[in-house]
Amino acid sequence: MGGGSALSLAVCLVLAVLAPAVSGDGATLESVPDLVKAMYLNIESFPCVRLLNLSGEIGCSNPGSEKIIAPIVRLTKGSDQLVQPSTVLLPSDQMSDFFLRVSNDPEFHQKVSGVLIESNGANNNLQELSPDGKFPQDAFAPYSNRSHNWNPAGSGIMWNRYDFPVFLLSEESTRVLQKVSEKNKKTDNGYKANVAEFDLVMQTTKAQTHDSASCLKERSCLPLGGHSVWASLPPIKNGSTEHQKPIVLAITSQDSASFFRDRSIGSDSPISGLIALLTAVDALSHIHDLRNLKKQLVFAVFNGEAWGYLGSRKFLQELDKGADSVNGINSLMIDQVVEIGSVGKAVIEKYPSFYVHAAGNSSASNKILDALQSASKSLGSDNVKVKQAASSNPGVPPSSLMSFIRKNMSTSGVVLEDFDSHFSNRFYHSYLDNPAAAALVARSLYILASANSVVDLMTLNTIKVNVSLVEELIGCLLTCKPGLSCGLVKSFISPSSTSCPSHYVGVFLDDPSGTQFPSYADDTSRFVWNFLADKTSTLAGNKSSCTGKCGDEGEVCVGAEVEGGGRCVVSTTRYVPAYSTRVKFEDNAWHVLPANSSDPMGVVDPVWTESYWNTIGLRVYAVQDSTFDWLILLAGLSITAASYCAVHVGRAYISKVVKRD
C-alpha cells in the first residue's frame, strides 16, 4: 500500500511539472482528449504524393514505413544552412531554388527530413513559379524541335523524386508554423523544441514497387485518370443520317499539373480556357437557327491532359473503336478543331490580344484564323485583337491539339492562347476576368459552322456573353470561397468536397465499362457534364423529375443529384473515360499493354500511376531534450525513493509509538 502511494505521488508530481509545458496557455485539462489536443496540433495542409511511371518515380514520400519527426527550422534564403536533420519551413518564393539545391547538394539533402511550403495567401507577390519543365510534355510534340522554351520560368522540380515528405500549408497553418519556428529560434539549444511529425508512407514504398508496371501488378497503385465530357449543339440522333455534317470541334482542358495533389500553386491557367468554353456554349445556346448551319458544333472538355494528354488520346481511341461513349460522331466527321488554351492573361493589356497557333499552313487552318479575325471585328468597341503566332515557333504550343496532329498530320486546327512564343503567365495563376475570350470563341464558332454560306450578321451580333456567368464560374472553379459550394454548381450536383477546387486529375477508380453512369467521377467532371447537357438541350416530352436514367432515347437526366431530383432533357452529352491508352482493365485489375508502333503517342506514354496510402497526416508538438527527460526520470526516482524511505521511517516510528502504549 505504501509503495503504491509513493508511486502515485511521484506521477502526480511529474505531471504537475509537465502540465504547464504541454498546455502552453494555462488552459484547464479535464480529460485525456484535452491533454492530447493540448499536446498535438494537427496542421491543415496539402501533400505532395508519390507518382510512378514506366521508368521510375517522382513526387514525395517518407523514405520508409515509419513516421518522420524533426525540429522545425525556417529558411528564408537559398544559402541558409542546416545544422541537424530538420523540418524546413520555406517561403513559396524560395521553392524552386530550394528543390534544385536539394537535387544538387547531397550533404544538404541528408539534413532535410521534411518540407513545409508557406501559403502565399491573397498577397501574391511571386514573380515567377512554375514547377513544370521549360517544354512541358515535349515527348508528345508533333515536331522535332524540342529545345524551344515555351515555359521560360519552368524549373522542372515537380518531375524529380524526393524521399522526404513535402506539404503545402494553408494560410492559417502558415501563420501558426511561423510562430512555432520563431519559438524554436529563440530557444535554440534549449531543453524544449517544436517538431513536425509526418505520416506520408506510400504503399509502393512498403511493397518495393518502384515503377508503374510493377505497382499495377502488385496492386499498390492506380492509373491516373478521370472522365472527359463532350456534347453537341444542337443534339444529334444516334444512328441517324441527317446529322452527318462536318464537325467543328471546340476543345479545352479541365486539369493542370501541380507539385501538390489537392491544391494548385499557380497552375490554374488552363481553367481560363474551360471558363471561356462554358461561357461560349451558354452564349450559343440562345441562338435558334443552329440546325440550319452547314456544320455541327461539338464541344469537348478533356481530363488528364497534364499527364500525357490522357483525355484527348483516349477520346481519339474511342472514336477509332466506335465506342458507345462517342456514339453519334466519328473521326472522319471532324473538319476543324479549335482549342481554347490559356486566355486569362490577355485581359491585362488595355486591349486584349489573343494569338492563334495553327497546325501547319493549310487553307482550312487559315479559314479558322479568318473566322477569329472576323469575330474580333464584329465585337467592335470591345477592341479584341487576334494575331497570328510567330512563324519562328516550332509548331503549336503544348496542347490537346498535339494529340489530333499526331493522330492525323493533316488535321486542320488552331490553339487560341494569350501568348505568342512563350507562356505569358510566369507563375501559372491566370484568371479569366473579362468575357472577351468567350465572346470571341462563340462568334468564331458560329462563323465556322456557317461554312461558306453568308453569315447572318444580325444573328452574329446577338451572340453576347453573360458577364455574370463568367464571374460566377471564376468563383466556383478558381477560388476557395465559395468554390464548388457555389450556387451554380449546387444547382446541378451535390459536391463531394467543400474545400478549394482541385484541378488534379486523380486516379481512375471505376470499371471503365460503365462509362455513361460512372460510380465515381470528380466534382468538376460531373458539373461540366450537367452544365453542357443543360445548355445544349431541348426539353423532353416527359417533364417528370428523374434521379438517373430517362425513359426515352436521346434523353439525359440533368441535376439528378440535387434535392428533389433532376429533369429529363434531350441532349447529346456523354462521358468519355480518360486514362492511358497503354493500360487495360481486365480480371478486376489494371495491366500495362506493350507499346504499339502505330500509336506514336502511346510509344512515348510514361503511363502515370499514383501510389496507394493508408493515412496522410501532419502534426506539430513540443518535445523535451533527452537530458531533460533523464532529469525528470531522476527526479521521479528520487521522489519515489524519498517517499519510500519516508513511509518506511514513518511505519517504524508508528510501530514504536504503538508498542510504548
Placement of each model-derived feature along the sequence:
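Secretory-pathway/membrane protein signature
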Residues: 1-661
